[in-house]
């Protein structure tokens, strides 16, 4: 299936997850398109009574429309409506010669799961000057556990095989993977022995990356996922952009503008 097909299909199901609520115990209907445009909120039924309260992000630099600065996008997209500009520009994890496009996500978010096929199709055709990174959100205990799982899989060289599988296990198999023991068993199905998993999961390297993701999430003022941050400067999502197809068009314009300024 091509990128355009993925984009059209995903638009019908995509909104965003806010506050770190875990997936519902039973599969809920996708949000309607008007819910997406209304403000990127998760339907009430998607938040079970046992949902863990979200953590309030620490104060961070506010997003600014900077009306006195020429918009780097075409007339189709407006700063303050389709994307916001962070002021000052925030750090990235990519080399200076690259334009970083970061996807802020959570494995427990059904909308992140829905967007993932489109993200992968876009990665396959992105410009060479774009560096794509995934950054897990860290706004609750469950989200932090999933962030540690992401960086553990990355450190073990398993993220390529396990990224999709983590989404499927949580959403299709209804296994939240919210404890170290559950994750250890799951990693075992990918040939990772218990000792290797534990030493990596509890390592200083993984802890440092989780802390860095937490810091950047606060700096980027991430309030919902999936969120896209272009070069530490521009923040958008599918709801703001007007849909999934528009989201990737906007990412392309913002990235091209940043590249031309290097």
Language-model regions, residue ranges each:
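Structural alpha/beta surface segment adjacent to cysteine/selenocysteine redox centers
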Residues: 103, 113-184, 253-258
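Sec-dependent bacterial lipoprotein signal peptides
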Residues: 1-15
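Solvent-exposed, acidic/flexible segments
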Residues: 76, 94-98, 102, 108-115, ...
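C-terminal cap of thioredoxin/glutaredoxin-like
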Residues: 5, 19-44, 49, 190-262
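Structured loop/turn residues at beta-strand edges in well-structured enzyme cores
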Residues: 12, 128, 223
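Extracytoplasmic thiol/disulfide redox context detector
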Residues: 8-9, 17-139, 261-262
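ABC transporter ATPase nucleotide-binding domain signature
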Residues: 187
């Amino acid at each position: 299936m091509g990128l355009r097909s993925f984009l059209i299909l995903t638009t019908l199901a995509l909104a965003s997850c806010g506050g770190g609520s875990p997936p519902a115990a039973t599969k809920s209907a996708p949000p309607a398109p008007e819910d997406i445009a209304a403000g990127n909120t998760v339907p009430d039924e998607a938040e079970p009574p046992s949902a863990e309260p979200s953590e309030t992000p620490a104060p961070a630099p506010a997003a600014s429309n900077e009306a006195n600065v020429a918009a780097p996008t075409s007339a189709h997209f407006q700063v303050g409506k389709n994307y916001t500009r962070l002021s000052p520009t925030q750090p990235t994890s990519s080399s200076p010669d690259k334009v970083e496009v970061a996807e802020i996500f959570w494995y427990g978010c059904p909308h992140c799961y829905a967007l993932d096929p489109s993200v992968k199709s876009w990665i396959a055709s992105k410009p060479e000057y774009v560096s794509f990174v995934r950054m897990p959100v860290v706004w609750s205990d469950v989200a932090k556990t999933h962030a540690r799982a992401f960086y553990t899989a990355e450190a073990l060289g398993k993220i390529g095989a396990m990224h999709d599988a983590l989404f499927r296990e949580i959403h299709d198999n209804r296994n939240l993977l919210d404890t170290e023991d559950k994750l250890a068993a799951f990693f075992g199905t990918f040939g990772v022995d218990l000792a290797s998993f534990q030493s990596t999961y509890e390592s200083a390297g993984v802890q440092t990356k989780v802390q860095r993701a937490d810091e950047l999430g606060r700096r980027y003022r991430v309030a919902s996922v999936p969120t896209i941050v272009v070069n530490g400067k521009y923040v958008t999502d599918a709801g703001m952009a007007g849909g999934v197809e528009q989201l990737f068009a906007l990412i392309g314009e913002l990235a091209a503008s940043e590249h031309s300024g290097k």
